[in-house]
A protein has these predicted regions:
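Sec-dependent N-terminal signal peptides of Gram-positive bacterial secreted proteins and lipoproteins
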Residues: 4-23
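Function-determining sites in protein domains
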Residues: 20-145
């Protein structure tokens, strides 16, 4: 009986731990605020940006370019948003809608929506299932738009 109780407790603990929030880690670690460009954009394509597909700049409209002197404040506000990396369920295969685009000095790009992220390296898209608190994400977008 104790064995089953112990196994049940371990299972419960595992379920609780996998649903914990995790801090979002940027593509290149902590960005150098002086060498990045941050924009709020709309990923307009109906099909979204699929993993492995080529990056297409034509389907993106810029809503707002964050001024360089506001980069640090913007990233500080962004880091306050809770992020989750679900271990169960289906993974996203594309992202679309309003996003944060971070362009690094080497040309790599990070696209962040409230329900998923994508990185662009050498023109190829790689999606990740990282979700953010959608209300806090929307408030951030509204604050800087």
């Amino acid at each position: 009986m104790k064995k089953y109780l112990f196994i049940a407790m371990i299972c419960l603990l595992l379920v609780l731990l996998v649903s914990c929030t995790v801090p979002y880690s940027f593509m290149h670690g902590e960005p150098d605020i002086d060498t990045i460009k941050i924009e709020i954009v709309n990923l307009e394509t109906e099909m979204g940006y699929h993993a492995g597909s080529p990056y297409n700049e034509e389907n993106i409209s810029v809503i707002k370019v964050i001024e360089t002197d506001k980069n640090e404040e913007f990233l500080s506000d962004f880091k306050k948003i809770k992020s989750y990396q679900p271990n169960f369920g289906s993974r996203i295969d594309c992202i679309s809608g309003v996003a944060i685009r971070i362009t690094y000095a080497n040309g790599d790009i990070e696209l962040i929506t409230d329900y998923g992220t994508a990185t662009v390296k050498n023109g190829e898209i790689h999606n990740q299932t990282t979700t953010f608190d959608s209300d806090a994400f929307s408030e951030l977008i509204d604050k800087y738009s």
